[in-house]
């Protein structure tokens, strides 16, 4: 029986959501996070992940800070994380990791959002 969580990836999460406590009520927060938080409403995803004593860390976060804005036609600036906020939050994430862990790790780059399949069209006669 597995008793320890090793993958803290959460669908749809933004960088800032790694740093704030998640509500214990799944209807008021990220559903998956409220189910695995060690202390809902107090602990953070990043804190819970670092508390497991990881030996390797993959930081692949940030896509969702732009994805909703891009797929929504860039029509709602309120859902776009500003460059300043993104930088502050990502620096806080990396700083927390470097200050709390001796694990090896990789920080993945965010691909150009327009390179995802959502933004490609295929002509009706493309497949013979």
Q: Which residues does each predicted region cover?
A:
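Active-site segments of SGNH/GDSL-like serine hydrolases
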Residues: 60-67, 73, 95-128
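Conserved SGNH/GDSL esterase-like catalytic core that processes O-acyl groups on lipids
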Residues: 1-92, 114
């Amino acid at each position: 029986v597995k008793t320890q969580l090793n993958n803290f990836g959460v669908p749809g999460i933004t960088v800032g959501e790694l740093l704030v406590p998640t509500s214990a009520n799944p209807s008021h927060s990220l559903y998956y996070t409220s189910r695995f938080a060690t202390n809902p409403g107090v602990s953070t995803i990043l804190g819970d992940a670092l508390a497991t004593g990881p030996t390797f860390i993959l930081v692949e976060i940030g896509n969702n800070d732009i994805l909703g804005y891009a797929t929504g036609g860039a029509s709602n600036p309120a859902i776009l994380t500003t460059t300043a906020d993104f930088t502050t939050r990502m620096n806080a994430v990396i700083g927390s990791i470097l200050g709390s862990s001796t694990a090896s790790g990789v920080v993945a780059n965010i691909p150009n959002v327009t390179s995802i399949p959502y933004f490609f069209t295929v002509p009706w006669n493309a497949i013979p």
